[in-house]
């Protein structure tokens, strides 16, 4: 079967209702880092402890400015003889320029990889479908597997799913093998699963706006508070040790007449009135009409708070529990 990226769009589904689905990830971009100074350089740029990152693990970390605000978050992992990371395509150019600023003084090459194909595999029996294609698959304990020219990443949240960094030839073989049993969908389905997982989505509209803790990166093991210096470290540490962070990422569910855009605010009900608050990171309307919104709000909100999409009197949004704990931040 001939394939073209992006795959034809369908309304996305929650993980509990998702059939086997092959997902094109056109809204994400891949960057590679190679060279003898790659570990040392990255260690001084991102919030995670790169020196301690095993070859079979991946991590969601922040790349911050001097004030501790994230240019982007990065899904970072080993690939080949170097590192690679995934980020939203909308922030690629600006974030890449920032992380390359001081690379001229180091022995490494940082570059966007426009040749690699990014695919997601999720839904019913995703593991069984891939088992017939690859020699070995990652799991919760060994999250990254290299199979020839393909790097496979495993995600446990919100349910087992896989991300493939591969070649056009392997992607074509995969589509050809699975297209009769799998649905095809575009990257909005992967975005929806990230919202359900509580993984913060940083697009261009929100670049440079949030410290990592405001998007729950500390709860996702994306911040090391014991590693050496990195850009923005002082502000990130102050937010933890002085309790300076007053925000958190929330998952809202409900209905609305429209899907809010990144960087919009939402409205919180206070008595008979509504007050604008927060910042939308991402949102998706599911196949059943339900609206999901990922939003940064004050971290002391009551669990039964009533919210709505801005200027939409018909909208109703409620807080859904995330699949991980923020207890250590409270």
Curated annotation (Swiss-Prot):
Its main location: cytoplasm. One of its GO terms (molecular function) is folic acid binding. GO terms for biological process: iron-sulfur cluster assembly; RNA modification; tRNA processing. One of its GO terms (cellular component) is cytoplasm. InterPro entries: GcvT/YgfZ_C, tRNA-modifying_YgfZ, YgfZ/GcvT, YgfZ/GcvT_CS, YgfZ_barrel. Keywords: Cytoplasm, Folate-binding, tRNA processing. It comes from the Bacteria. Signal peptide: none annotated. It is found in: Cytoplasm. Folate binds at residues 28, 190. PANTHER family: TRANSFERASE CAF17, MITOCHONDRIAL-RELATED. Folate-binding protein involved in regulating the level of ATP-DnaA and in the modification of some tRNAs. It is probably a key factor in regulatory networks that act via tRNA modification, such as initiation of chromosomal replication. HAMAP family: tRNA_modifying_YgfZ. Belongs to the tRNA-modifying YgfZ family. This is tRNA-modifying protein YgfZ. It comes from Serratia proteamaculans (strain 568).
């Amino acid at each position: 079967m001939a394939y073209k990226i992006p795959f034809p769009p369908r309304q996305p589904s929650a993980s509990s209702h998702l059939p086997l689905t092959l997902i094109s990830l056109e809204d994400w971009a891949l960057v590679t880092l190679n060279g003898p100074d790659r570990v040392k350089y990255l260690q001084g740029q991102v919030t995670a402890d790169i020196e301690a990152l095993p070859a079979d693990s991946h991590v969601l970390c922040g790349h911050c400015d001097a004030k501790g605000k994230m240019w982007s978050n990065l899904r970072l992992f080993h690939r080949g003889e170097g590192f690679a990371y995934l980020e939203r395509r909308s922030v690629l150019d600006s974030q890449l320029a920032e992380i390359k600023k001081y690379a001229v003084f180091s022995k490494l090459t940082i570059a966007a990889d426009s040749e690699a194909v990014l695919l997601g595999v999720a839904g019913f029996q995703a593991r069984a479908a891939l088992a017939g294609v690859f020699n070995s698959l990652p799991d919760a304990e060994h999250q990254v597997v290299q199979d020839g020219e393909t790097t496979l990443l495993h995600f446990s949240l919100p349910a087992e799913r896989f991300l493939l960094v591969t070649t056009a030839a392997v992607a074509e073989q995969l589509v050809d093998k699975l297209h009769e049993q799998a649905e095809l969908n575009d990257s909005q389905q992967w975005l929806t699963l990230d919202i359900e997982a509580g993984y913060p989505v940083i697009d261009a509209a929100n670049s440079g706006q949030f410290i990592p803790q405001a998007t729950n990166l500390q709860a996702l093991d994306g911040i090391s508070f014991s590693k050496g210096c990195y850009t923005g470290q002082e502000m990130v540490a102050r937010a933890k040790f002085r309790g300076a962070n007053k925000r958190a990422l929330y998952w809202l569910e409900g209905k609305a007449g429209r899907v809010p855009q990144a960087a919009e605010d939402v409205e919180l009900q206070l008595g008979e009135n509504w007050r604008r608050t927060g910042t939308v990171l991402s949102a998706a309307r599911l196949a059943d009409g339900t609206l999901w919104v990922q939003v940064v709000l004050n971290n002391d909100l009551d669990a039964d708070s009533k919210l709505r999409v801005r200027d939409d009197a018909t909208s109703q949004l409620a807080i859904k529990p995330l699949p991980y704990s923020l207890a250590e931040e409270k």
